Amino acid sequence: MNTVLAQQIANEGGVEAWMIAQQHKSLLRFLTCGSVDDGKSTLIGRLLHDTRQIYEDQLSSLHNDSKRHGTQGEKLDLALLVDGLQAEREQGITIDVAYRYFSTEKRKFIIADTPGHEQYTRNMATGASTCDLAILLIDARKGVLDQTRRHSFISTLLGIKHLIVAINKMDLVDYSEETFTRIREDYLTFAEQLPGNLDIRFVPLSALEGDNVASQSESMLWYSGPTLLEVLETVEIQRVVDAQPMRFPVQYVNRPNLDFRGYAGTLASGRVQVGQRVKVLPSGVESNVARIVTFDGDREEAFAGEAITLVLTDEIDISRGDLLLAADEVLPAVQSASVAVVWMAEQPLSPGQSYDIKIAGKKTRARVDGIRYQVDINNLTQREVENLSLNGIGLVDLTFDEPLVLDRYQQNPVTGGLIFIDRLSNVTVGAGMVHEPVSQATAAASEFSAFELELNALVRRHFPHWGARDLLGDK
């Protein structure tokens, strides 16, 4: 057993007391990102090593792996603690998103180690979508690079407000304060154009040597700020979803027997209480919450992020993809929206194309009406383009096949975030963040043939009980 873990359990008075104490610690989700070979995996390995989160058998295996795959000579290659795929070890790079878990006396952590190569930007965006904080690594020898800017912009686009700029490999520039200051000023100049009110902090460190990671560096006495671990333990994270109105997307209708009918899902934002009056969208039907069922039994109330099953007092028609919210709240369904897109496919995103989209458990289809602009990563300016290529980031206008209930992504990532799915291959080809729902929109007649429009009108006239929508959007 890990000796530090054993000591913590002893200090708490046993395993049960230790587990209770762990449950009450705050949780911080963060990712490491940046350009290729900036030391992201090594930094995570150093954090795990210096906080004594590595078991003896893992340490022994690391010694052996360092001899076979290591890139640090006689030293331990701490990156191998994270880079688990064979291709990653052979190439000395990170490909997949690797998750690691550790805790200190003050906090619990979930780390997402994301790849730095441009071709794996999609993996980086996936890792960032669930994080509260980003550690952006910069090689002290290279300074701010294009991938540094791209990862910074994607992180802020995905709602991350806390950035730690870790200027790594300071040992290779003789721990130069001048180098640190220059890179800091360069990044701050770039960051002025990033959206939102950001909390940006700078830490000079050496992940390989351990300087300023978990303990103060004796080689950088000119730096009087906190270590990286101290920043992680003390940064105050305010989750947007806690203060937002209630949103409960239905993931699954749970009906194990004739006497029980519940609606399972994760509460996306706000809180819900037994007896609360709720409304189902898009139908608009109202009911009261009779029970809140969890794995640990019934609860009187639940909060954002908790997986629950709601039982209502009335037997009403609710299916996967429907949204429950407070009965007194008005949230109109929309059939169009402007969406910030991170494109992840070789085939460019072009106007006129249609994709399956998935948002908060609901799957439907959307058409690309136009591309307003693409963001130039170098200076964050907007430029007109005909299509959005691989790893491109831009603002796109979408029209949906059916009315959807949406929030802006910055208000609610669950009901404002979507993915694009290729209809033939079923591969995820893009990530979207709702910028602004458009209250009224109509489909373009040119999308449908004359036969399709006539057939649609015929079905709606003679078979209204089928509920077919008007392809032209005339309600």
From Swiss-Prot:
Ranges for domain tr-type G: 25-239
SUPFAM superfamilies, sorted: EF-Tu/eEF-1alpha/eIF2-gamma C-terminal domain (SSF50465), P-loop containing nucleoside triphosphate hydrolases (SSF52540), Translation proteins (SSF50447)
Pathway in which the depicted protein is active: Sulfur metabolism; hydrogen sulfide biosynthesis; sulfite from sulfate: step 1/3
Annotated stretches, region: G5: 206-208
Top enzyme category: transferase
EC number(s) recorded for this UniProt protein: 2.7.7.4
Keywords: ATP-binding, GTP-binding, Nucleotide-binding, Nucleotidyltransferase, Transferase
Gene3D superfamilies: P-loop containing nucleotide triphosphate hydrolases, Translation factors
Catalytic activity: sulfate + ATP + H(+) = adenosine 5'-phosphosulfate + diphosphate
Region entry G2, spans: 92-96
InterPro entries on file: CysN_GTP-bd, CysN_II, CysN_NoDQ_III, G_TR_CS, GTP-eEF1A_C, P-loop_NTPase, Small_GTP-bd, SO4_adenylTrfase_lsu
GO biological process: hydrogen sulfide biosynthetic process; sulfate assimilation
G3 as annotated region, ranges: 113-116
Record's function text: With CysD forms the ATP sulfurylase (ATPS) that catalyzes the adenylation of sulfate producing adenosine 5'-phosphosulfate (APS) and diphosphate, the first enzymatic step in sulfur assimilation pathway. APS synthesis involves the formation of a high-energy phosphoric-sulfuric acid anhydride bond driven by GTP hydrolysis by CysN coupled to ATP hydrolysis by CysD.
Oligomer and partners: Heterodimer composed of CysD, the smaller subunit, and CysN.
Protein's name according to its UniProt entry: Sulfate adenylyltransferase subunit 1
Lineage start: Bacteria, Pseudomonadati, Pseudomonadota, Gammaproteobacteria, Enterobacterales
